[in-house]
């Protein structure tokens, strides 16, 4: 019984957002971690993301039954009713937003609201089904957790918060498109107008390359503005250079699905290492460059 509800929350997505929230928190903490605040921030963010994922499951029932990788989900198999799932999502959301509002701060709460509304409203209900730009919209929600973690410590939105918001958003593009190429038939059968399906795999490869370069340029800004140290500069650029290399060899790939799987898996490794590295690649004291 509990397993069904756990999988409604999409554990893989929860883990990914847990790691990126941790990364934002570490960057802001500069080695001085308030562990109670960290636990509360992680719990609040995880419950909010879980709530959004459950609602997404309810919205995507018709799509999920057409895709091989999702056709065994509880709502598709009708082992959990939509009304029960929505009640579950509501409880998760109340807990998550409550933690962020009462025990973290209004900045983290606000970015949780932004991420939730974009994911459920603008992405799941609208652009996922209608627009080639769905991935850009969805990236806003994906970029919110590291900012939640960062602002939990700083109580302000500064240049570093802007840079990590942009960078994590840019990372989402090749990451998501790689999944779509790897699962091309699933997305095509479900009628989802994601870039590889709506345009072409070749165009997707070109745009993956562009977004990886933009991702690198933005994150290097953390060093340029004085938020990270030289070790970050070197290791981050080595990792990103390899990701760029994987993107480039995709143009000569004999099997697009295998290449896309490789690109996707490395994107996960990259963002995980990047997020965890903020625990020791920060520059202290960090500059005070508030935006609001």
From Swiss-Prot:
Keywords on record: Cell inner membrane, Cell membrane, Heme biosynthesis, Membrane, Transferase, Transmembrane, Transmembrane helix
Stored CDD domains: PT_UbiA_Cox10
Record's bilayer topology term: Multi-pass membrane protein
Pfam families tied to this protein: UbiA (PF01040)
UniProt-annotated location(s): Cell inner membrane
UniProt keyword RNA-binding present: no
Transmembrane annotation, as ranges: 13-33, 35-55, 84-104, 106-126, 135-155, 161-181, 206-226, 231-251, 263-283
GO cellular component: plasma membrane
GO BP: any one term: heme O biosynthetic process
Enzyme Commission number(s): 2.5.1.141
Keyword Cell inner membrane: yes
Coiled coil: none
GO MF, any single term: protoheme IX farnesyltransferase activity
Reaction(s) the record says it catalyses: heme b + (2E,6E)-farnesyl diphosphate + H2O = Fe(II)-heme o + diphosphate
Pathway noted in the entry: Porphyrin-containing compound metabolism; heme O biosynthesis; heme O from protoheme: step 1/1
Record function comment: Converts heme B (protoheme IX) to heme O by substitution of the vinyl group on carbon 2 of heme B porphyrin ring with a hydroxyethyl farnesyl side group.
Miscellaneous notes: Carbon 2 of the heme B porphyrin ring is defined according to the Fischer nomenclature.
Family as reported in the entry's similarity comment: Belongs to the UbiA prenyltransferase family. Protoheme IX farnesyltransferase subfamily.
Protein name: Protoheme IX farnesyltransferase
Gene: cyoE
């Amino acid at each position: 019984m509990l397993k069904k509800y756990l999988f409604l929350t999409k554990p893989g997505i929860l883990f990914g957002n847990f790691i990126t929230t941790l990364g934002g928190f570490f960057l802001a903490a500069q080695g001085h971690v308030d562990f109670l605040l960290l636990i509360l921030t992680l719990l609040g963010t995880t419950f909010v993301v879980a709530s959004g994922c459950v609602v997404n499951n309810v919205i995507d029932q018709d799509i999920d039954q057409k895709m091989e990788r999702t056709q065994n989900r509880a709502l598709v198999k009708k082992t959990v009713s939509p009304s029960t799932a929505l009640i579950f999502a509501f409880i998760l959301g109340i807990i998550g937003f409550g933690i962020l509002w009462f025990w973290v701060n209004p900045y983290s709460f606000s970015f949780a609201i932004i991420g939730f509304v974009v994911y459920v409203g603008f992405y799941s209900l609208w652009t996922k089904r209608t627009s080639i730009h769905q991935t850009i919209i969805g990236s806003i929600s994906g970029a919110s957790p590291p900012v939640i973690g960062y602002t939990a410590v700083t109580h302000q939105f500064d240049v570093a918060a802007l840079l990590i918001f942009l960078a994590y958003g840019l990372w989402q593009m090749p990451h998501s498109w790689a999944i779509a190429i790897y699962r091309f038939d699933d997305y095509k059968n479900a009628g989802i107008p994601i870039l590889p399906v709506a345009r072409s795999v070749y165009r997707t490869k070109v745009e993956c390359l562009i977004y990886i370069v933009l991702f690198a340029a933005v994150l290097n800004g953390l060093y340029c503005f004085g938020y990270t140290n030289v070790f970050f500069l070197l290791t981050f650029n080595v990792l990103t250079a390899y990701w760029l290399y994987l993107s480039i060899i995709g143009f000569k790939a004999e099997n697009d699905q295998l290449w896309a799987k490789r690109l996707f898996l490395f994107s996960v490794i990259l963002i995980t290492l990047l997020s965890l590295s903020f625990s020791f690649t920060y520059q202290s004291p960090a500059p005070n460059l508030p935006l609001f």
